[in-house]
Amino acid sequence: MISDPIADMLTRIRNGVMARHEVVIMPASRMKQYLAKVMKQEGFIAGYEVIGAKPKRQLKIVLRYDEGGASFVSGLERISKPGLRVYVQRGEIPRVYGGLGVAIVSTSKGVMTGSQAWRQGLGGELLCKVW
């Protein structure tokens, strides 16, 4: 059993990028789908889909590379962990690499980027940073 499924997801994406894989497959959950949706909206991944039946659903993430073979994901960092949750208010949401990356925040209105949460005046759990 995995103690931190979100960290496992980020690690699988990181390993897939380093190995130059086109897709990575992992066990699916709603939170992972929300994270994949935000990453797709921000252009870090090419797409995602849920495959399989209910008890053993899998999340398939299609990684994105440019013409030179460089990945659009340079780095991923888990912030809030099961043993130490990190919550931020609107003004405490960090900028990632001067706006080149995104902070992903779980708010009362759903999972969104830090800038979207800031614009809506929301704080929440700071899940991870992607750049």
From Swiss-Prot:
Gene3D superfamilies: 3.30.1370.30, 3.30.1490.10. GO terms for cellular component: ribonucleoprotein complex; ribosome. Keywords: Ribonucleoprotein, Ribosomal protein, RNA-binding, rRNA-binding. SUPFAM superfamilies: Ribosomal protein S8. GO terms for biological process: translation. InterPro entries: Ribosomal_uS8 (IPR000630), Ribosomal_uS8_sf (IPR035987). The keyword rRNA-binding applies. GO terms for molecular function: rRNA binding; structural constituent of ribosome. Part of the 30S ribosomal subunit. Contacts proteins S5 and S12. Belongs to the universal ribosomal protein uS8 family. One of the primary rRNA binding proteins, it binds directly to 16S rRNA central domain where it helps coordinate assembly of the platform of the 30S subunit. This is Small ribosomal subunit protein uS8.
